[in-house]
Amino acid sequence: MVVKVGINGFGRIGRLAFRRIQNIEGVEVTRINDLTDPNMLAHLLKYDTTQGRFDGTVEVKEGGFEVNGNFIKVSAERDPENIDWATDGVEIVLEATGFFAKKEAAEKHLHANGAKKVVITAPGGNDVKTVVFNTNHDILDGTETVISGASCTTNCLAPMAKALHDAFGIQKGLMTTIHAYTGDQMILDGPHRGGDLRRARAGAANIVPNSTGAAKAIGLVIPELNGKLDGAAQRVPVPTGSVTELVVTLDKNVSVDEINAAMKAASNDSFGYTEDPIVSSDIVGVSYGSLFDATQTKVMEVDGSQLVKVVSWYDNEMSYTAQLVRTLEYFAKIAK
């Protein structure tokens, strides 16, 4: 049985999700909705500065484009309620615009001739289940209509924090994500559409402090850590490839080797482990949602009290997209 997917919003995440779905048997994209001209969408699908050229053929046709011989309809509806997903057999919508990230807004895809399920590619709030695959995807029972795939940083932080908490117990902690610049920053100094004075500065020429909800949102993924973590972001001049540092106090004293052993034991398809001295360009395109770096683990002890730092890499584009697609595929399999 083939699960048919619709993508609303064909930006960075929408296009990369489309790429990954091409390699998954039993899942296919049959419709894309985006306000941009199909010629532009096709061009941006074919050519990608950070992720490389699309491995396949893309041809613009009337009403959409043809990818590897398969026609995908492209529409340009502003209101999700006006997208006739059912005509193209769409069962699950990947909501990737950023504008319909709350449950009530995302549910518009389910109205009229809509789809059956929605996966939001952003934090969705307290009234939807927030899923980080291979960390808490077992909270899904298939009856849900709208779920959230959290954020790219939460997908990096969550598996590392869970492994640390399961093994040693986290008391409290602060995280910092050293994050690639994104499309919501200016290329050159100029007014920021959201009024942010720092994101108004040239993204490729500055380290730009920014907020992140990833640490606080961890409670939606790992309830035992609710209220125990906080954090911030520093946007840096790289186009993709980010890293998260987590500094915590634990319930018990530990060694660097014990921490690394626990992380290695917890590794899986979503949570990688490396002892190589890598840099940010080395993780561009990786499919791990989080890649733990054992070379950066630190334990500081003063008067018997310890402070622990752990570090994990992520491609804030592809790592996150890979996790979203894993979640979507699983959600489709258990759907009721």
UniProtKB/Swiss-Prot annotation:
Q: What is its main location?
A: cytoplasm
Q: Which reaction does it catalyse?
A: D-glyceraldehyde 3-phosphate + phosphate + NAD(+) = (2R)-3-phospho-glyceroyl phosphate + NADH + H(+)
**Entry GO terms, CC:** cytoplasm
Q: Is Cytoplasm among this UniProt entry's keywords? A: yes
Could you name the active-site residues?
152 (nucleophile)
Superkingdom, natural source: Bacteria
Annotated D-glyceraldehyde 3-phosphate binding lies at: 151-153, 182, 199, 212-213, 235
Recorded GO MF terms: glyceraldehyde-3-phosphate dehydrogenase (NAD+) (phosphorylating) activity; NAD binding; NADP binding
Q: What class of enzyme is it?
A: oxidoreductase
Q: CDD domains per the record?
A: GAPDH_I_C (cd18126), GAPDH_I_N (cd05214)
Query: What keywords are assigned to this protein?
Result: Cytoplasm, Glycolysis, NAD, Nucleotide-binding, Oxidoreductase
| Family annotation (InterPro entries) | GlycerAld/Erythrose_P_DH, GlycerAld_3-P_DH_AS, GlycerAld_3-P_DH_cat, GlycerAld_3-P_DH_NAD(P)-bd, Glyceraldehyde-3-P_DH_1, NAD(P)-bd_dom_sf
Q: Where does NAD(+) bind?
A: 12-13, 34, 78, 121, 316
Pathway info: Carbohydrate degradation; glycolysis; pyruvate from D-glyceraldehyde 3-phosphate: step 1/5
Marked site positions, Activates thiol group during catalysis: 179
Asked whether the keyword Nucleotide-binding is assigned, the reply is yes
Q: Name one GO biological process term.
A: glucose metabolic process
Instruction: Write the Enzyme Commission number(s) for this entry.
Output: 1.2.1.12
Question: Tell me, what does this protein do in biology?
Answer: Catalyzes the oxidative phosphorylation of glyceraldehyde 3-phosphate (G3P) to 1,3-bisphosphoglycerate (BPG) using the cofactor NAD. The first reaction step involves the formation of a hemiacetal intermediate between G3P and a cysteine residue, and this hemiacetal intermediate is then oxidized to a thioester, with concomitant reduction of NAD to NADH. The reduced NADH is then exchanged with the second NAD, and the thioester is attacked by a nucleophilic inorganic phosphate to produce BPG.
Q: Which NCBIfam families match?
A: GAPDH-I
Annotated family? Belongs to the glyceraldehyde-3-phosphate dehydrogenase family.
Q: How does it assemble?
A: Homotetramer.
Instruction: Supply the name of the protein.
Output: Glyceraldehyde-3-phosphate dehydrogenase
